[in-house]
Amino acid sequence: MAIKGPRKHLKRLAAPANWQLPRKVKAFTVRPSPGPHSMDKSLPLLLVVRDILKYADNAREAKKIIQTGKILIDGLKRKEYKHPAGLMDVLSIPEMDENYLVLFDESGRISLKKTDKTDAKLCKIVNKTVIKGGHIQLNLHDGRNQIVKVSDATKAEEDVYKTGDSVLVSIPEQSIVGHVAFGEGKLAYITGGKHVGEFAKIVEVENRALYSDIVTLENKDGEKFKTVKPYVFIVGQDEPVISM
């Protein structure tokens, strides 16, 4: 039998392994709504409020809290309990003066890191294209697109943003206010593989034509390791450009 329409339910046993979620308490959990992040790199807001922050004992209480509009993601009110909070999103509760950054812990599980109040977030450029009018469109990891107006997209001095770079996006205005290029010597945050959740400096980049580039990194203990470029998220030069 064919599947007709979008799936609306999710069994706990089928939920992504990196969700911090008891598997055998109940049969079903919340399926995040389609949007800025893939399901394995985000958590629905209800689970954030109930299971991670522990601000509610059950789904009903969590929904009431979310529907008040007191929880912000990237500076915007989110009242939909299925809305996904994903990697590098800034979650704020102004009434309680609490701010969190969505990251992965060293086991690869989605977690919240308490941070200082911030007016910007980091986004990774996953693709880019030249659009009508000759301007450049940057496609970022959290689903947003940013238009960079240029007079000539073929000129290197104007086309400064490359795939794999990171940009600093102001919140809630959602405009680019900073740029950190991908390259040797840059500080990276690892988002997948054996070293997920670690910070390390890029030592070498091996370019490959048909496969993902291989990046050699060195962590704070002096240990060198290799991973693929899609797992490398640039966060700064010597220190992260935001509180992490």
Swiss-Prot record:
One of its GO terms (biological process) is translation. Signal peptide: none annotated. One of its GO terms (molecular function) is rRNA binding. It comes from the Archaea. Residues 43-106 form the S4 RNA-binding domain. The keyword Plastid does not apply. This is Small ribosomal subunit protein eS4.
